[in-house]
Design a protein with these regions (language model features):
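Feature captures the catalytic ectodomains and active-site-proximal regions of enzymes
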Residues: 1-285
């Protein structure tokens, strides 16, 4: 089993490198391979772009160094860690769903609503997500210090409660519909007077879920995305150091365990399980 390496080789440590590149104070380990030499930092996060898939796609070689994700490694937890500089146990967004004692419900963190209801961001009427979790945000900290940040993300998550703590409500935001306009905005941001540029790309994760992580559609997507990002980034390497990374990878699943079919197990729960399929939390009697 592979554990997160929080001492210098994890997504958490990349968050510390971002903080350092913006001239903000941090007391926690950074990624040593990213020198603090005055270059600005550009981070491109490809959702679901795992190390093994990268090797099979031909964009990584066997033996290349890698960093780990965080635990839990689901997108919500990983992205918030990356953009807050907080460990999962500090920001407390521990999966796709979380039991929030203050509200007395299990909430869907992607849609910020109770899991058994409909209505995206409906809990905003009770308390904003940013206030519920009290997450720090590196973009907000940097902007207060006079830094300029560009955040490029898909249109379908624009103005959602989740993006207030993953992308921040500060900085300059650019929404895109497909990879091609994402790369356009990315190039424009690198050409602009920004101190930090962040691009989030979800496509590989979607294809991994539909076709499998090592399917040709997903491997071709990884190849195309990585090569396209590199073509843009190389023209700006004198000013920006570009890091292409991921929130997590994927593995091919074997047998699924349906815990709901075990009546004895169900009877021990005080509330339904929450978290995610890769990291389930139980509250038992």
């Amino acid at each position: 089993m592979l554990y997160p390496d929080y001492e210098g080789r994890s997504l958490y440590n990349l968050s510390q490198s971002i903080i350092t590149s913006l001239g903000l104070p941090t007391r926690r380990p950074v990624i040593k391979e990213i020198p603090d030499d005055g270059k600005k930092l550009s981070v491109v996060l490809i959702d679901g772009f795992g190390y093994r898939a990268g090797i099979k796609a031909g964009v990584l070689a066997e033996g290349d160094p890698f960093i780990t994700s965080v635990f839990p490694s689901i997108t919500t937890t990983a992205l918030i860690t990356l953009m807050s500089g907080q460990m999962p146990g500090e920001h407390c967004v521990l999966g796709g769903t979380t039991f929030v004692k203050k509200l007395g419900v299990i909430i869907d963190n992607f849609s910020y609503m109770p899991v058994y209801t409909k209505g995206r961001d409906s809990l905003k009427e009770i308390t904003p997500m940013k206030e519920l979790y009290q997450v720090e945000n590196t973009i907000e900290r940097a902007e207060r210090e006079g830094k300029k940040c560009a955040i490029i993300s898909p249109d379908f998550i624009k103005n959602s409660e989740l993006t207030t703590i993953t992308n921040s409500s500060s900085g300059n935001h650019f929404s895109y519909y497909h990879l091609w306009d994402a790369l356009y905005y990315y190039r424009k941001a690198l050409e602009g007077d920004y101190d930090f540029v962040y691009l989030y790309i979800p496509f590989a994760d979607k294809l991994s879920h539909f076709y499998g992580p090592y399917s040709e559609p997903n491997l071709e997507a990884i190849r195309s995305i990585v090569e396209a990002v590199k073509r843009v980034a190389v023209d700006h390497r004198s000013r920006f150091r570009t890091v292409i990374t991921a929130d997590h990878g994927h593995v091919e699943a074997g047998e699924a365990i349906q815990m709901g079919e075990n009546a004895n197990l169900r009877s021990t729960f005080t509330i339904p399980p929450f978290g995610s399929t890769r990291s389930i939390f139980f509250s038992g009697k």
